[in-house]
Structures are given as structure tokens and as C-alpha cells.
Amino acid sequence: MAGKKKNDRHVEGDEVIRVPLPDRSKGQLFGVIEQALGAGWMDVRCEDGKVRRCRIPGKLKRRMWMRVGDVVIVQPWPVQSDERGDIVYRYTRTQVDWLLRKGKITQDFLSGGELLF
């Protein structure tokens, strides 16, 4: 019989997870969504301690739902960089667990404490 059987497909051992990280050279930051404002806007608490009003670009808005408590990557705007930004990426629960294990974010940051880099 040609082809692989269903049982041959699962991988044994360590699972490889590819997680995009914020590009610090572009000024990107980790953030946690605090409030959904409607019309594609969210209040996001960023790792530098500031709360920014962030926009969800159309390509992300159509592809995935964003909820309060989600961990995201924020790209601050060149103008009003302390107040506004764009959401670039949303992490899944598995990816957030990986970030916690690797020390990229802390539980304090997720629960509302300040994280300053």
C-alpha cells in the first residue's frame, strides 16, 4: 500500500515550536490586551509600562479574533509612539506557555504587574 499510515505521522520526542519574537530594532514590544474598544481598536498594556490604544490591521482582523488577556506584539507608531500602535501578531496559548518557559515574559506581566526591560 502506497503512502504512510496515520500512526506513522506523529512525531516522537520534543516538539518544535516556532514563535515570532518582537523585533527590538523596529521598536516592537510584548503587550497584553486589556480592553476591546470596538471598530478594530484595543487598549494594550505594553512591557514598558505604558497603555497604548492599538489598531488591529485588516489582514489580522479578518484572520483571527483578539480577546482580552491575549498576548500580542505591538508596533508603536512613529508619531504618538507612547499612545498609539498597531498589533502585529497574537500568540496562541501554547506559544505563551513556551514564552513563559523560556523566560521571555513573566507571569507577573500576564497577571497585570509591570514588566520593565
From Swiss-Prot:
It comes from the Archaea. SUPFAM superfamilies: Nucleic acid-binding proteins (SSF50249). Keywords: Initiation factor, Protein biosynthesis. One of its GO terms (molecular function) is translation initiation factor activity. One of its GO terms (cellular component) is cytoplasm. One of its GO terms (biological process) is translational initiation. Pfam families: eIF-1a. SMART domains: eIF1a. Residues 17-92 form the S1-like domain. The keyword Protein biosynthesis applies. Seems to be required for maximal rate of protein biosynthesis. Enhances ribosome dissociation into subunits and stabilizes the binding of the initiator Met-tRNA(I) to 40 S ribosomal subunits. Belongs to the eIF-1A family. This is Translation initiation factor 1A. It comes from Thermococcus kodakarensis (strain ATCC BAA-918 / JCM 12380 / KOD1). The lineage of its organism: Archaea, Methanobacteriati, Methanobacteriota, Thermococci, Thermococcales.
